A protein has these predicted regions:
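Non-heme Fe(II)/2-oxoglutarate
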Residues: 1-83, 91, 100-102
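Generic marker of residues within folded, mature protein domains
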Residues: 5, 82, 105, 174, ...
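A general secondary-structure signal for short beta-strands and their flanking turns/coil
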Residues: 8-10, 85, 110-112, 192-194
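Hydrophobic residues positioned within well-ordered beta-strands of beta-sheet architectures
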Residues: 13, 88-90, 113-115, 195-199
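Solvent-exposed residues in well-ordered beta-strands and their adjoining turns
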Residues: 16-18, 118-120, 200-204
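Catalytic core of non-heme Fe(II) oxygenases with the double-stranded beta-helix
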Residues: 93-173, 193, 207-210
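Catalytic core of Fe(II)/2-oxoglutarate
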Residues: 154-225
Length: 225
């Protein structure tokens, strides 16, 4: 018998924004102006430009985002009808030219799910990378590290690799847990700009499903102190 048991896979969902073509046509130019300017601001929060979801012209995008989150929940075999999604922050990210730095490894705090919508990309756009700090399969320290001259690895596979890359396809959205560490990586000379909309989502139970302990009650049932 020769069998490998694979367990506990992480899911990053990639789906289609069905209003993409019209949304891009109507909003691309104005969204460039909403860029949080990573050159001047350490984070989108520092710029104050984190409320894209409040703009009425973006309603179709967030309606489609809801459908995609429903699909993400379905893949996890969760009854999405029990939950409401609340976009807490949303912003525009831009790589204007080949000199723009890639996004450094980070995760998003104070939210449940995060998303990245690829409004404008091409084949040279930076890849989306998910990375893990520790690998449960690395049974000895430094076993999976690589060097120029000597290596214990014969090559990378799904068990020994600590970075997974996803191609940024225009018109699609990635949905993933906010505590997942991620970054972008440049693989080739960029030929065109890359415009994305990213954001954070809080997930709560609907107000009538407060008897479920697997989740947070709806904000309408909270008390602000």
């Amino acid at each position: 018998m020769n069998k490998v048991h694979e367990m506990f896979p992480l899911v990053v969902y990639q789906g289609t924004i069905d209003c993409h073509e019209q949304f891009k046509k109507d909003n691309l130019d104005s969204l460039r102006d909403y860029w949080f300017n990573g050159y001047k601001n350490e984070s989108p929060e520092c710029s104050g430009r984190i409320f894209l979801h409040e703009k009425k012209e973006c309603k179709s995008l967030f309606d489609s985002l809801k459908c995609n989150i429903d699909q993400y929940m379905t893949h996890l075999n969760i009854d999405h009808t029990l939950f409401k999604y609340h976009v807490a922050k949303s912003w525009v990210g831009a790589h204007k030219d080949d000199s723009t730095p890639s996004v450094v490894p980070h995760f998003h705090n104070s939210s449940d799910l995060s998303f990245v919508y690829y409004l404008k990309t091409d084949s040279t756009s930076d890849k989306f990378c998910v990375d893990q700090i520790s690998n449960s399969n690395e049974f000895m320290d430094c076993l999976f590290e690589t060097a120029e001259k000597t290596n214990t690895l014969l090559g990378y596979n799904r068990y020994n690799c600590n970075v997974y890359t996803i191609t940024p396809i225009e018109g699609t959205v990635l949905i993933f847990p906010s505590n997942v560490r991620h970054h972008t990586q440049k693989f080739t000379e960029r030929k065109d700009e890359r415009i994305i909309i990213a954001g954070d989502v809080r997930v709560t139970l609907t107000s009538k499903h407060f008897k479920y302990h697997q989740g947070t009650t709806h904000p309408s049932q909270w008390l602000e102190l």
